[in-house]
A protein has these predicted regions:
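An aromatic- and histidine-rich active-site surface loop
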Residues: 22-32, 45-76, 80-82
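Acidic donor-binding loop of glycosyltransferase active sites
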Residues: 110, 236-241
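Acidic anion/phosphate-binding donor-loop and adjacent secondary structure
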Residues: 124-125, 132, 140-156, 175
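Membrane-proximal helix-turn-helix segments that form the acceptor-binding/catalytic region
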Residues: 55, 62-67, 92-114
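A conserved catalytic-core segment of Leloir-type glycosyltransferases
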Residues: 1-31, 36-40
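Conserved donor-binding/catalytic core segment of Leloir-type glycosyltransferases
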Residues: 155-174, 179-184, 197
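Nucleotide-activated donor-binding/catalytic signature segment of Leloir-type glycosyltransferases, i.e.
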Residues: 206-233
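Carbohydrate-associated surface elements
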Residues: 118, 137-140, 226
Length: 241
């Protein structure tokens, strides 16, 4: 009954520098591959919920091949494109390596799952797999996120403004620095009540806060921090956009 969880080590990406991000990305797959002998076995298939890095599917490939069982890879972050949103890789050889490794790992899955039809087409083009081997299963959010939730205290705090609300993880992929600059431009053009409310956390939070301070945007943006999932509707209900 239930799920048995086996954890593997990883090198934390302290400071989110290029070096620590790289070490974080490569460490978990290596540690996980070395820990496969801890698994009791008897499995019918291997399923990978493949976010970042793409290398996280390598232990799954290794286990499936050893035990001759099918491997399905649910692709949520497309690599190496997602990598480039975090690390500005300019070297053409390194980009070729990232592309080649990513395509090779995707090809080694017996079946791929994409989040959307455009991603499905992209994976088919890159792997040469037939359409029947690349399914589409869209992501969704739990029903409670769609139910408005009024919080009088929050509504009083953020009333009288046009609230642009973002909830989630702050990473370079979200380009929230661009959003902040756009809000400032809009306010300068006359949208004086426009306010950016950022709920969450992530590797870009410190740089975003530094940018807000540099641009004197203290009254333009609020960094609320992380909240429990069930609290999120209280913030999205505040959103005018």
């Amino acid at each position: 009954k239930g799920a048995h969880i086996f954890r593997a080590r990883e090198i934390p990406r302290k400071g989110n520098t290029g070096k620590t991000i790289f070490l974080n990305y490569v460490s978990w797959p290596l540690y996980a591959a070395g820990a496969l002998n801890r698994l009791p076995g008897g499995y019918d298939a291997v399923f990978c919920f493949n976010t970042s890095p793409v290398l996280m599917c390598w232990p799954a490939i290794k286990y499936a091949k050893k035990h001759k069982i099918p491997f399905t890879n649910y692709v949520l972050d497309l690599w190496p494109e997602n990598l480039y949103s975090v690390l500005p890789v300019k070297n053409s050889f390194m980009r070729w390596v990232a592309q080649t490794v990513s395509d090779s790992l995707y090809k080694r899955a017996d079946r791929l799952i994409a989040m959307s039809v455009p991603l499905q087409k992209r994976l088919i083009a890159r792997t040469g797999k037939p359409e029947k081997d690349v399914a589409v299963i869209s992501q969704y959010c739990e029903d409670f996120y769609a139910v408005p939730c009024h919080d009088p205290e929050l509504e009083a705090r953020f009333s009288g403004r046009f609230n642009l609300v973002f909830t989630g993880t702050f990473t370079p992929a979200q380009s929230l620095n661009m959003v902040l600059r756009a809000v400032l431009d809009a306010r300068a053009a006359g949208a004086e009540n426009l306010h950016l409310l950022l709920v969450g956390d992530g590797m870009s939070r410190e740089s975003l806060q530094a940018l807000a301070e540099e641009l004197h945007a203290g009254d333009v943006v609020t960094f609320y921090g992380s909240v429990p999932a069930e609290k999120v509707p209280s913030f999205t209900t505040l959103a005018d956009a």
